């Protein structure tokens, strides 16, 4: 059909306006496009093109029979031109009013027995009503004018967005200029007023999108809302931008929730079981200097709580309420600065930046790279710049060691995180560190939990008890009398680098935690190491294997979480599928029930 129409256009030498009218009123089984009708309406403002358009329309309206689509599409195009075209179109239509009156009796039944003339009769009645009712015609033309302005604005807006994206790709460093930013700033109040008049806007949109059928009883926009809508509601893109620019309601500040220790430890145990390895983190690589700087920044995987109370323990810890949960004692030297505290020459903890986030979990504690410094003593290696020749005696000055407690706010059983392994800054030599750790390990009533076998200790959380199989250090009661004797004279305790002292040092494996007790030492350090040796004694191959194993654990954990997410998505899709199936069944039943009365009415009419 299209090829035949093109040949006919070429043979009869039709003008551009006539070709467009013929295409809009063709015999194709679809309606004319809005862009084509818009072009034809623009041509009506030209006198020559207007006469050509109207002559072709009247010629198409005189068709009958199988060319009933010519008539219907001509009425549709005429209705569009009356609303959007020149006012001279209205004069031409009123001059041929009698031709429109004859179309009210148009009859045509196709081969399938369907009355196709019904739509032509109804459309002709609408056009005649529009031509006779002057106020209705004015309102329809105003609505069409606003629609046209909004459409043109949306086209310009899309072109501006395209130009800005092209400039962004051309120069990525230059910021993209937002042309309509000032307009959005001043149009927001007007958009708020339009939002209050929701019903009026809905009525206008209904008329703009359904231009083929316009009933006189439809709700029309008042003259007062015309400038508001022209300036405040230019396109749907502006509406979307306004919604994006609206300030969000402030969320209620909720205190950080403390994760239950049993739940956290159970999750960590599952991760350990999946990976088939220990939960104790290992160092990924050895740096050339052997130094590690740990800075507890404000990250999403922060572990330590910022509710640390630096108060001396004046009463035994057994008398405290069970609702406060378990607390971990961490020994902090009194000579630390306000901003940064040096736990050892290699370990630096920023006190001002350490925070607690409710997103933290024991899994991140076990597998986070920032805590790999606490795995083994061999990795907490003093830099060569701090190393000093071995001395015959090492004496530690009197330093008051303050104890701090991390208080958990959860009403249930609260959990304490892994304490830091700390030593004095004076312990500069790796050879002396082994001798200095043996008296420090022996703390009064301090004990640490076993890493793999911890069946004797349990947390009481209402009626539930769970055994902990992880390397989290706990603490025992500390008396106030012991705190008075904080000074430590290592000269009287340790011999001068003798072989007997080296033999007496207990080598604690990385999979067990020891239990120590002495009389007058107010300090403990949980250790998980295979031996007190320098980094030169340890090969680097096992550490590389450990780093690979840690990465494999993280990959396995990510895959497991992805599998869980996919399973939930599949379940939701199944639910949606079931709902859609039920809706389709209901619609089919309704259609069948509606067909039954129609068939009964048809039989009664035949009777």
Curated annotation (Swiss-Prot):
Q: Give yes or no: UniProt keyword Coiled coil.
A: yes
Could you mention a single GO BP entry for this protein? endocytosis
Which domain of life does this protein belong to? Eukaryota
Any one Gene Ontology MF annotation carried by this entry is: clathrin binding
What keywords would UniProt list here? Answer: Coiled coil
Q: Name one GO cellular component term.
A: clathrin vesicle coat
Q: Which residues form a coiled coil?
A: 543-574
Cross-referenced InterPro entries: ENTH, ENTH_VHS
Q: Which PROSITE patterns match?
A: ENTH
* Family matches, as Pfam families: ENTH (PF01417)
SUPFAM superfamilies attached to this UniProt entry: ENTH/VHS domain
Ranges for domain ENTH come to 9-141
Spell out the protein name for this chain. Answer: ENTH domain-containing protein 1
What's the source species for this entry? Homo sapiens
